[in-house]
Each structure stands twice: as structure tokens, then as C-alpha cells.
């Protein structure tokens, strides 16, 4: 009996880290889905805000950048300020601040209230990204590439659902009550998170897990540039997509369907592009997806509404899937093995680019045409191809190590 009890105790001790790891990953994924859903759900409101507040394309992009730019610009300060805070506290704080921003936007405070609420919500999301990523890497150590892919994928689930729900509700409700409902959803997620996530991270080998390679600052710096351009393409196209659908005769509900199709394709693209990278390598897979992105974006300029809706899931695969390959490479190229700082820098690059790029593309459209703005976004993806080729000397050793780790991990 004593031997049996000892065996049960040993089994429980072995299973506890696995259970806690799954809880950590689930907590990070739920919060990531909410915040990414908040981020891209705002696209459904852009045509309404443009009409109500009489904004140009560039002005609309500036309003959008109040959220996106705040989220990107505060990545590093948020990472530094909350390094001594437990994962539960950091993710709860991120969610509650974002909820406060949506509550402010939902109040009848005019254009100034909308802008202030966007900034507050952006502050909350700036906390979530680096702290959620570090929670996953600390939990899984050297085997974090696959869980990071799951974490990255969870964001696309939020992108696929919240924008569609918002677009479906907007023909029925005014836009402020819809924002209020999104805030209520955030409170529900905060309650779930409070009972789910542990107060501390579950592994003590973060020093080992952080030092898994790293080809130097040159490789990491180029990776952040590539990530920024990839995000610029995506956010630039998303700026114009609602207006492209309206121009084809679609309504608000059709815009929601179009966004959902694009984001569902993007979620599927996370798995597809990781699979592709294992066969073509990171360099070959990124080159292929960026070339396809350029061609498909330009193709949507010449297709009717029905054909455009058919193309959007395919475009979503390559438009959004590339980021998963780039994101999974961050720990291997992290300067000095500091994955927390590396993720914060990478997010600053991609989110900052996502905030600035629509302003640039919007200005191009304002001074020429919407079509030229869309073409500019597509050509940005093509510009990534030679940069990825230049990344090869830095990326190859780290990527090989990561793939070996991923294939050997349970």
C-alpha cells in the first residue's frame, strides 16, 4: 500500500507541471484572443466613424493609430515596469485597462472621448503582448516554439470572431452600445482569467530557455524590420478592405463576413505556414507567402464581390500566416538571450509599423486613389523578399536548432 501511495504521489507530482503549463497557456491564449479581437474589431467601426466625424482616409488612419500606436509604443516600458509582477496580475491589469478604454469610447463624450478611449485601450493591450509571450516561453522553456504557435493562433481566433460579431451587431445597434458589449466581454474574460492563471510562472529554467541560440543583433534587427513590413502590408490592406467591399455593393454585414473570411484564413495560415516552413525552410516559405500576398492583394482590385469573398480566405492564409514563422524565430535570435525584451522590441516594431503604415497608405489614397493605396500595400509584401534572403546567414543556425527542439519535444 505504501508503494502504491508513493507511485500515486510521484505520478501526481509529474502531472502537476503539465496541468499548470496547460493552464498558463490557456490563460495566455484567452487574453490574447480578446485583445487581438479588440484590435481588429475596431475595423468594423471605421466606415461609421469616417461618416459621423467626417474623416479622410489619412485622418481615419490617425484615429486608428491612437490605439495601435499606443499599444506598440508602450511595449518596452510595459515589459520593464511589470517584470516583477505575477503573470496573473499583469494579464488582469492589461484586460481591465483595455475594458476601461472601451467603456470610455461607449460613453457619449464625442470625438474627444473616442480618441481618449482608444489611447486607454491601447495601454492595456501594450501590457498583454510581452507579458503573455514571456509567460508561454517561461512555462515551456526550450520546447516553447509549438506553444508559441498556439498562442499566436489564439489571437487569430479573436480576430476572426469579434470583428464579425461587431459588424453583425452594427446594423441593429448604434456603435456605442456595441462597444459597451465588447467591454462586458472583457470583464467576463477577466473573471475567467482570475480563476485560471497561476500567480507565478511554472518553470525555473528561464535562463536556459532564453539562451537557445541568438545569431546576434544584426539578425534580430533585420527580423524586426521584416516583421514590421509584413504587418504594414496587413494593416494597410485592412484599412481599405471595408471600403473595397462597400464599393462592390456590399453592406455592413458583408464587411463583417469579409473580415471574418480573411481572419479565418489567417488563423488557418498560422498552421499552414509553419508546416510550409518545415519543408521549404523559413527563407523559402516567407518568400513564397509574400509573393502570393502581393499577387492576391492586387487581384482583389479586379474581382466582383462574390469572387473577392472567395479570394479573401486564401489571401488571409498568406497575409497573416507569415507572422507565425517570424514570431517563432524571435527566441532563437533574441540578443543576449533576453526573450522578454526581444518580444517587446519585436512587438514594438510590428505594432508601430501597423499604426504608421495605414497613415502612409491612407495619404497615398487621399492624394491619388484607393486602388493605388491598395497596390502600395501589396508591393510592400514584395519588398520583403530580398530582405528575407539577406537574413539567411543569421537565421539558418538558429532555425535548425529550433526545428530540432520542436520535433523532439512531447
Language-model segments: residues:
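C-terminal transmembrane helical hairpin of 12-TM major facilitator-type secondary transporters
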Residues: 281-329
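C-terminal membrane-cytosol helix-exit motif in multi-pass small-molecule transporters
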Residues: 183-205, 386-392
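Conserved MFS/SLC helix-loop-helix module at the cytosolic interface between two early adjacent transmembrane helices
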Residues: 73-109
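Cytoplasmic helix-loop-helix junction between adjacent transmembrane helices
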Residues: 117-155
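A late C-terminal transmembrane helix in Major Facilitator Superfamily
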Residues: 337-367
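Helix-to-loop junctions at the C-terminal end of transmembrane segments
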Residues: 74-86, 269-281, 365-366
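Extracytoplasmic gate region of multi-pass secondary transporters
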Residues: 42-43, 218-270
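Residue-level signature of mid-helix packing/kink "hotspots" within the transmembrane helices
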Residues: 40, 68-76, 160, 263-271, ...
Amino acid at each position: 500500500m505504501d508503494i502504491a501511495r508513493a507511485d500515486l504521489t510521484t505520478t501526481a507530482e509529474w502531472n502537476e507541471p503539465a496541468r499548470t503549463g496547460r493552464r498558463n497557456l490557456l490563460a495566455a491564449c484567452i487574453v490574447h484572443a480578446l485583445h487581438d479581437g479588440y484590435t481588429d474589431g475596431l475595423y468594423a467601426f471605421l466606415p461609421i466613424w469616417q461618416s459621423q466625424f467626417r474623416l479622410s482616409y489619412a485622418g481615419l488612419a490617425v484615429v486608428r493609430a491612437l490605439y495601435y500606436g499606443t499599444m506598440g509604443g508602450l511595449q518596452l516600458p510595459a515589459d520593464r515596469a511589470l517584470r516583477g509582477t505575477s503573470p496573473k496580475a499583469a494579464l488582469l491589469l492589461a484586460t481591465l485597462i483595455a475594458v476601461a478604454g472601451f467603456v470610455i469610447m461607449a460613453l457619449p463624450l464625442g470625438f474627444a472621448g473616442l480618441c481618449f478611449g482608444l489611447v486607454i485601450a491601447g495601454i492595456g493591450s501594450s501590457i498583454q503582448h510581452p507579458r503573455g509571450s514571456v509567460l508561454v516561453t517561461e512555462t515551456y522553456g526550450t520546447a516553447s516554439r509549438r506553444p508559441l504557435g498556439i498562442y499566436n493562433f489564439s489571437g487569430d481566433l479573436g480576430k476572426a470572431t469579434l470583428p464579425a460579431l461587431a459588424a453583425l451587431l452594427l446594423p441593429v445597434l448604434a456603435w456605442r452600445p456595441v462597444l459597451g458589449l465588447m467591454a462586458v466581454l472583457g470583464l467576463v474574460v477577466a473573471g475567467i482569467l482570475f480563476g485560471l492563471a497561476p500567480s507565478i510562472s511554472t518553470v525555473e529554467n528561464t535562463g536556459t530557455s532564453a539562451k537557445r541560440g541568438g545569431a546576434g543583433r544584426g539578425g534580430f534587427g533585420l527580423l524586426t524590420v521584416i516583421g514590421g513590413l509584413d504587418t504594414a502590408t496587413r494593416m494597410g490592406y485592412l484599412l481599405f478592405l471595408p471600403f473595397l467591399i462597400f464599393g462592390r455593393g456590399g453592406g455592413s454585414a458583408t464587411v463583417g463576413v469579409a473580415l471574418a473570411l480573411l481572419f479565418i484564413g489567417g488563423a488557418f495560415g498560422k498552421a499552414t505556414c509553419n508546416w510550409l516552413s518545415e519543408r521549404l525552410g523559413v527563407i523559402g516559405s516567407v518568400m513564397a507567402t509574400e509573393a502570393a500576398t502581393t499577387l492576391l492583394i492586387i487581384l482583389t482590385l479586379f474581382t466582383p464581390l462574390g469572387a473577392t469573398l472567395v479570394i479573401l480566405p486564401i489571401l488571409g492564409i498568406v497575409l497573416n500566416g507569415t507572422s507565425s514563422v517570424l514570431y517563432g524565430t524571435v527566441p532563437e535570435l533574441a540578443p543576449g538571450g533576453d526573450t522578454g525584451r526581444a518580444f517587446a522590441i519585436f512587438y514594438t516594431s510590428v505594432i508601430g509599423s501597423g499604426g504608421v503604415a495605414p497613415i502612409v497608405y491612407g495619404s497615398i489614397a487621399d492624394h491619388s486613389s484607393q486602388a493605388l493605396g491598395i497596390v502600395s500595400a501589396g508591393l510592400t509584401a514584395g519588398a520583403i523578399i530580398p530582405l528575407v534572403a539577406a537574413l539567411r546567414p543569421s537565421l539558418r543556425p538558429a532555425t535548425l536548432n529550433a526545428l530540432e527542439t520542436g520535433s523532439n519535444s512531447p
